Structure formats: C-alpha cells, structure tokens
Amino acid sequence: MDDASVLKYLQENPKLVEDFVVSNEISPETFKRWAVRRTMKYKNVKNGTSGGTGAWTEPDLSMKRRVILETSDNRTRILYEITQCCGQLIGTNSIELIVQNDEGAFSCRKTENGELKLKKVKTSKSADYIQTIVNAGNQTIAEIHFYTQLDSTEKSIVNAVCTWAAATNYYSELYTHKQEGSDGQDIHENIAKQRKLSNFLLDVARSIFHDIVSMDAVIIKVMNFAQKLVDADRASLFLVDSKNAQIYARIFDVGTGDEEHVRVNSEGQKEIRFDMSKGIAGYVASTGEGLNIENAYEDERFNADVDSKTGYTTKTILCMPILIRGIVIGVVQMVNKHDGVFTRQDEDAFEIFAVYCGLALHHAKLYDKIRRSEQKYRVALEVLAYHSVCNADEVNKLKKIEINNRIVELETIDFNGMRLSELEKPLYAVYMFKTLFADTLRFDTEDLIRFVLTVRKNYRRVAYHNWAHGWSVAHAMFATLMNSPDAFTKLEALALYVSCLCHDLDHRGKNNAYMKTMSTPLASIYSTSVMERHHFNQTVTILQQDGHNILKSLSSEDYKKTLSLIKHCILATDLALFFSNKAKLNVILDNNTFDINRQEHRLLTQAVMMTGCDLVASAKPWNIQTETVKVIFEEFYDQGDAERLSGKEPIPMMDRQQAHMLPQMQVGFMRGICMPCYDLIARIFPKNDKMRERCEYNAKKWEELAEEQRKKQEALAQQNGEANETQE
C-alpha cells in the first residue's frame, strides 16, 4: 500500500486516527513534540512564515550544549541561541534579536554560511511583544522582538528562559575573565559599582520630580556624588553663561583661595566667575571635550595660584562636560583621586552620570525660573488686586446714604436703569440683595457694599457689556424673583441674583467666536464658553478677596452648592447653550412631564431664566429698547472693525457697512431667540408673562421699521434704475 492510499484511508477514518494518537502506543514525549509542531505550523501560516520546530525542541540537546560551550566567550552568539530557543519553544519564526551596546542598537541576522551579522537599527518595526535581557548590573543588553501575539503562558516561558540566560551570561563573562587572568573580585566590584551608579541615577531621576527645591540643592547633590563616583578628594561644578562667555559657581568652599573671584550677582547671591578662555574648566566648557590630567602641574592650562595661596596640592584632575542636546551647560571638575589616577572606567561612569545630572540641572534651572516667575506673578497679582478692588472711601460714602425701606418701582421689569447715577446703581444693587435675603441669610453689610462696588470696578468700559448691563440683568432677576417668591429655594435665588450681577465681569466687548478665531489667551485657557467661564472665575476671584465674601456665613456644603449653581447660571448665559436648553424644555412641557421639583427640570428652568434676564432689553419699553440696541450694535461694529483690520470679513450683524439692515437683523434676533425664550418662561411662570408681551410688542415695532427700510431700499433702487436709463 502506497503513502497516498494510507493518507486517504486515515482521512476517511478520523476516529481511528484519534484513538491511535491518544492511546498508550504514543509516548507523552512524542505527543508533546507533535503538539508543538502543530502549534508552530499554525502560527507560521497565520503570520505568513514557514519553519519547523527546530533543534531546541528535540529530545536530544547534546548538539546545542556543545554549541553553547564552544561559544561561551561570544555574547552575541549566546544571545542568538537564546532567541532561537524562545522562538522554537512557542512555535514561531517571527522573531528578531536586537543587540544593544555602547554604539547603539543592532539587529542580529544569520547569513547563509552560518555567520552572525549585526546591522544598525535606524527605525524599528512595531513588535507585538518585546522581551528584554539584562545583565547583572540591570542594564539591557538585548531585546527579543516577537511579531506575533503571545498568550500569558508563552510570555512566562520566554521570561523564564531569558532570566536564566541573563544569569548564564554573567557567569560566562566571569569565566572568560578568569581564563584571561582577570581577578574575579574586580568583576564583582565593577558590577557592584554599576549597581550603585544605577541606584543613584534613579535617585537623581526622583529628585527631578520630587526633591527639587532649588538649583543649589541639585548642584550640591551632583557634586557630592561626582566626588564619590570617582573617589576624588574634591569636586566643583561650574555652570556655563554662554551670553558672557563665562563659567560660574554658586556652591564653593571659600577656604580654597577663590575669594578674589567672588562676586555678588543681580539676585544678591555670591558666585565665582571665570572667563571660558581660562583654566581647565574653561577649556572643557569651550570645547565640550573631557580632560583626564595625570599631572596638573605639567599642563599649561592649569592655574597653580590657587594651590600656592591655600597650600593645597593638586595632582590629578578629571574635568568632564555636562551637555543638553549637544550644548555644554556645565562642567564638573574632580581633583585628586585618592588611589592613583583617574581611569578610563571613571570617565565612562561619569559620561553615563552626566546625562542624568544634565537633565537634573536643566529641570532645576527651569524650576528656578518658574519660581521667580511665580514670585513676580504674585507681586503683579497683589498690585492688580489693590487696583481692582474698591477703596474704603467708596464704601464709607455708600454706607452713609439712606434709602427707603421699599422701592416699589424696582419690582417691575419696566424700570429704566439708564436714568440712575453711578452712585445709585450700586446703592440699588445692595438694596435688592437685602430685600431678597435679609430675612434668610446672614451677611455683613460692609462686605456686601464692598462686593458690589468691586464688581462694578471689574466691568470694563465697553459699549454694552458693562456695569450698566450687569446691573440691568440683576434687576430683571430681582423683579422675577419678587413676582415668583416661592419658585426657587433661597440658595438658588441667591445664586441666580449674584450670577446676574456678575455674569459679564471683565467682558472685552468681543464674543466667543472672536476669541477663538483670534487665538486669544483666554481661548487657549477655555475650550468652550470662553467668556462665560472667565466671568465665573472673575466672580470667584472677587469672592476670595478680603472683606468681599458675601457667602461666608453659609455652611461648607451650602457654600459649595451655591458656587456650583453660580457656575451653572453664568455658563447658561452663553447663547450657544440656549438652543439645546430650549429644545429639552419644550419636549418636557409638550409631554406634560414638567416637574419643578425635579433637579434636572429646575436646572433647565434656571438656565432659561438667566437667558431671559440677559436679554431683558428686548422686553423693556420701546424707548429703552431702542436706546439699548444702539449701544449693542456699536459694540458689534467695534468687533467687526477689529476683524476687518485683521483681514477677516465680519458677519452682517457686526459689519458697520450693513448698518441700514439693523431693523431686519433685530427682527430675526427677536423672533429667533428672544420670543422663544419668553414663551418658555411664561409657560413655566405665568406671572412673568409681561416679558413675553413686551417682547412681542417690540418685535412688531422692529418689523414695521424693517418694512419701511425695505420700501426705502426698493424706492432707491428704482430711482437709480431710472437715472441710469436717462443717462443711456
């Protein structure tokens, strides 16, 4: 019977094959080998590679044992065999060995004649799993890159093999050194020193993020370890002042004879300065090359004056640069090794150390710079706070003015705030606060006056979004709360009134779109509702000033709740948010599911109330409405002018050249935003229907003006057409 017939028979009788494979006729070792071959074949097909199980999966490993013994002095070959072993154990050829040494990372490949070739890695492929191999000093000497998925068991196998391999590599190197006549104790000491260096480098890294107090603290740490690292008697660290071509040190021993070089810098700190053209440290700073001098007095760059003054004898010097991105930022000079001269090993150790201490010095320098900037910022903030809060004379002047117990005219939306003087507005703002909260909230009257006056001072003198507008919106909320006293809790009413008074603090007369388009600093701080978030932060800043916290009598919980409500209310004045709030409320009201006691419904109601009060000019008597619209559009035109100056075309509403379209634009604004807002408020609070009625009246008046303007435009166009015909 030929092979084909046997294969056909087995395919037709799979149960017979299965029974035979799992029977005692097949040894466990053979079964396992078959399973490995099957797994490897599956992985190779999946990854588009081919290959067998390999010598490492065979029962007899004597050949591999001989290879390891014969190549024990060849680290690269040992690492290659480890890689092949790992690949064959988990059944994949999709692996790559990356060997690391002082010159960089190299990919290891086996040529057709069996030789190993190293190729510099420029760009590494993305591996599914990377297993590192480290030496006794915990330094990475190789990586095995797997370009196939490994499960947890396979990863454990690879990790175990590489752990044993790392230990084997150590003993292999130890054996090689002994064969060459090296002292094994030296190797142990070298490994201990490497471990010590690694631990310190970790310590330096920690200090960068945790222990940085000042540049001086980091310098002392660097000097102390540099001295211990190479077993030097003394160590000095000089920083480079490239602007003045000098090196300087702030940490020094005045007993070394350097007193004549001591200067006091602009910050009142003592420091030693030398020209970079002088001395050994200057040479290293200028060239970026390290110097290992066995006899200082034989080097012409050495200045022996210091020794003659102090009686100290300099013998050996190791002077090394500290670099960041190839630029020398400092120089460490180590003097007189305790035992002999500085070695190449000392130089190598310091080169590694220099990378980390360069990073530490760089961060410390940044820290010092940030700390100085912070101090300047605090001074500036202190000066700003002084000039942005009201003074004692203003407070005393307002305190002395007597006011009626009740001002009935303030309780209607029709009240004209434009006729109030600059003194009366804050006086009436205080009155409205007291009227609303005198019976339910403990507050200091002087703090309240101070708060209101400072709020006034922090509104900018722009055409519309100024103190007069803030006062008008607060008055609208006052009138609304007086007409619906039970609609909100006292904390909610407090948040609503304070929010209205402060809702446009520090407004610059430009909208959010302008802030984002022009990439202003505020737009970089806040991603959404730019100005509204700034207004809220300004409110909090004022509340935090001494003698301004009108909420200080609240409990901690109530204070947090009130601040949260103030933030919610001020952000709600962003008209971009109104449309989603309107849509949600309309659905709730249309479905007859509105419940003022539900938190979600209350927040939506408060948001729409804020919008209604912010737009209150559209619900004022016609004469107040027209006067307000003039200043609104003047501010719009100012923004449009600024946009045009920067090369951008403003929208028609902000284009001064489209001023004749004002009535038509107002109709769109009144019908598209104002009326829907007041319709919602009237559905929730029928007593506040007057705002809707007044807004409807004003909208019709604007429609009449828009129609008149349209007729004028048509007549003018007709006249121009007739004139052109006459000329022809």
Swiss-Prot record:
InterPro entries, per database record: GAF, GAF-like_dom_sf, HD/PDEase_dom, PDEase, PDEase_catalytic_dom, PDEase_catalytic_dom_sf, PDEase_CS
GO MF: 3',5'-cGMP-stimulated cyclic-nucleotide phosphodiesterase activity; 3',5'-cyclic-AMP phosphodiesterase activity; 3',5'-cyclic-GMP phosphodiesterase activity; metal ion binding
Protein's UniProt keywords contain Metal-binding: yes
UniProt xrefs under SMART domains: GAF (SM00065), HDc (SM00471)
Residue positions binding a divalent metal cation 1: 469, 503-504, 614
Function: Redundantly with pde-1, plays a role in the AFD thermosensory neurons to regulate microvilli receptive ending morphology, possibly by regulating cGMP levels.
PROSITE patterns: PDEASE_I_1 (PS00126), PDEASE_I_2 (PS51845)
Coiled coil (residue ranges): 691-728
Reactions this protein catalyses: a nucleoside 3',5'-cyclic phosphate + H2O = a nucleoside 5'-phosphate + H(+)
Region listing for Disordered, in residue ranges: 708-728
Gene label: pde-5
Protein name per the record: Probable 3',5'-cyclic phosphodiesterase pde-5
Organism for this UniProt entry: Caenorhabditis elegans
Keyword annotations: cGMP, Coiled coil, Hydrolase, Metal-binding
Chain ranges of the PDEase domain: 390-709
Cofactors named for this entry: a divalent metal cation
Residue positions binding a divalent metal cation 2: 504
Active-site residues from the entry: 465
GAF domain boundaries: 214-371
Protein family according to the UniProt entry: Belongs to the cyclic nucleotide phosphodiesterase family.
Segments of skewed composition (Polar residues): 716-728
GO biological process, one term: chemotaxis
This enzyme's EC code(s): 3.1.4.17
Key word DNA-binding present: no
Free-text cofactor note: Binds 2 divalent metal cations per subunit. Site 1 may preferentially bind zinc ions, while site 2 has a preference for magnesium and/or manganese ions.
